[in-house]
Amino acid sequence: ILTVDPNNSETLYLGTDDDGVYKSTDGGESWKKLTVSSLSKSFGVGDIIVDPQNSNNIYIGTVDYFRLSESRGVLGDFGIYKSTDGGATWEEFNVGLNHLGVFSLELSEENRILYAGTRAGGVYWISLDD
């Protein structure tokens, strides 16, 4: 998943299948891995949204995955996470989701509603003005 900041085309966010989120502030020349402290070091990203009204507000939908290693399997974390500081820190934003894998996010600018499409087939929404 590649998302361009709608207010700065040099700022890009890259979500991976099982290695988290990366950020570039130079149009993709270099990348920095973002740390989401409440998630495991490796997690899958279903979608990334940058708020067009405030580029510091970023939402990621994380997806569940199962990775096999030589000794065991590991179930990944999933849900919605929000940053209000351009990706420096993150908090869980799973109001009503009960940790469902999120594969799609859409933000209605007019209504300020964030929609989340889940693995379970449902669509959830939350007002960002609350």
Segments (PLM) and residue ranges:
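Extracellular glycan-interacting surfaces
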Residues: I1-D130
